[in-house]
Amino acid sequence: MLVLGVESTAHTFSLGLVLDGKILGQLGKTYLPPSGEGIHPREAADHHSKVAPVIFRQLLNAHGITASDIDVIAYAAGPGLGPALRIGAVFARALAIKLGVPLVPVHHGIAHIEVARYTTASCDPLVLLISGGHTLIAGFSEGRYRIFGETLDVAIGNAIDMFAREVGLGFPGVPAVEKCAESADRLVPFPMTIIGQDLSYAGLTTYALKLWKSGTPLPVVCKSLVEAAYYMLAEVTERALAFTKKRELVVAGGVARSKRLRGILEHVGREYGVAVKIVPDEYAGDNGAMIALTGYYAYRRGIRTTPEESFVKQRWRLDSVDIPWFYDLCEEVVLNTSTKRRP
């Protein structure tokens, strides 16, 4: 079964292919907003509509397949930017009608988790999902991912991106801020807001800008900002590990590329005797492969829709989605691991 995945939730339009549960490849292009500005949803949508047919042709040609080979189309139905989501959905619907194949709506955040589980050979981990649009800790229980802590306002990636934009470091903000932080000679105290297991990052950005405008050297502000942001994550992750007793920690989402954060989380893993597994860089950001992979498992469990009944949801909580395929992926992990261990 060949599944095409369509990702268009924010600044990236990407298509991915999965054949019988194996990722074949992906291809995408990212909308870059004007310098000093955030994402303009309608401009991102215009970008996606222009690049979609080009990426589709290039992806098929790269793998020597034709459109008629596609059996299922999975698309990111949310959460995300409304105009951008609709472009991906329209593309998926039109192609499904033309090819006469079913559609599978996929939750973008769950797709991040599933591709991380798949690529790190993890079965039942505690998950830290961190990106421009997500900051949460989750674990599987009773048919769904249950959230053990999340941001109360903006996601960590968005918070750092906003700071980077305001101080002229460009987009994406996380690598730019971390690069700037390398030349810092000290740290300054930052307020860290943790309420129970939940986090607040909006105030962190505001405080960082206040420090910078008051004359604190930019590298010092950058270093202090990322250290505070990451140690907030580490604290709530430690608590969740202690509560859930999970033996694996999987880190998913674009911010998982951060080498500094990896070091902090690996230290947490050593303290708790937990294996820390981080999604490979190529699947950390938004990508069509994660949509295709999740769509593949969902379709096998009977989840599908028609073009007429397909939908998009700008706001869609991760813990509202049933995951009937959860242990199917576990079986795949066990099979692959045991195969690799054979002499």
UniProtKB/Swiss-Prot annotation:
InterPro entries in the cross-refs: ATPase_NBD, Gcp-like_dom, KAE1/TsaD, Kae1_archaea_euk, Peptidase_M22_CS
Q: Which cofactors does it use?
A: Fe(2+)
| Binding positions (Fe cation) | 108, 112, 286
Compartments where found: Cytoplasm
A GO MF label = N(6)-L-threonylcarbamoyladenine synthase activity
**Record-listed E.C. numbers:** 2.3.1.234
Offer a single GO CC term for the protein: EKC/KEOPS complex
Fetch the SUPFAM superfamilies from UniProt: Actin-like ATPase domain
Primary location: cytoplasm
Entry's family note: Belongs to the KAE1 / TsaD family.
Q: What is this protein called?
A: tRNA N6-adenosine threonylcarbamoyltransferase
This protein's species is Pyrobaculum aerophilum (strain ATCC 51768 / DSM 7523 / JCM 9630 / CIP 104966 / NBRC 100827 / IM2)
